[in-house]
Amino acid sequence: ESGSVQEGTLCFTLSNVDPYEFSLIGNVHTNRTNSPIHSIYGNPKYPLVKDKHMNDKLIGPGFLGFNAGHVTVDSTDPASLTEAMMKGRKLARQLHEGLVEFEPKSFGASFLASTANLMGIRESRRIKCDYTFTLEDWLARKEFEDGIGRNCYYIDVHKQDATVYPRYKKGESHGIPFSCLTPAGLKNVMVAGRCISTDSYAHGSLRGMPP
């Protein structure tokens, strides 16, 4: 609504992670109280690490994928995208160096295997449809006569000043109406995916993709 969008992320992979040592810690996710990201963030050696966002997934033996770090980017601006891609690669290297420093048993012999070909964009243009799903709808667990799906994902907004809302309890969900996929004033047209008609906070939930 204001033109301010969520942060982007350039995903990356590490290879030659020690399988045994990594099995002892399980992951380096932000939620782990002794995750190395808590030492990396704020360390002057890693100035591009501006928050503690870190998700990791074991892809294969010694091969780890990361959705980690944030880069400010406007995906409608080619220059901004280019700058974000360059900064994202530098950020991936800094995160790897931090993992080597603070979790050397697992990452000491690892190397940066790849960075994504495209910037991960969480929020960009959305299409104005016959109905706009809002934060209030999410909070109310609203049902719709034209519901075509259900969602229970939390409000996951990647902004440092974002308001945090309580997650749904087990078994709770809301409906997703067909009318937030049909562009206003058009016929025989349907939109789906990130451009779904929502407000910014509701988008933080509906944008989510299962792993």
Question: Can you describe what each PLM-predicted range is?
Answer:
Residues 1-209:
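Flavin (FAD/FMN)-binding glycine-rich loop and adjacent Rossmann-like elements that form
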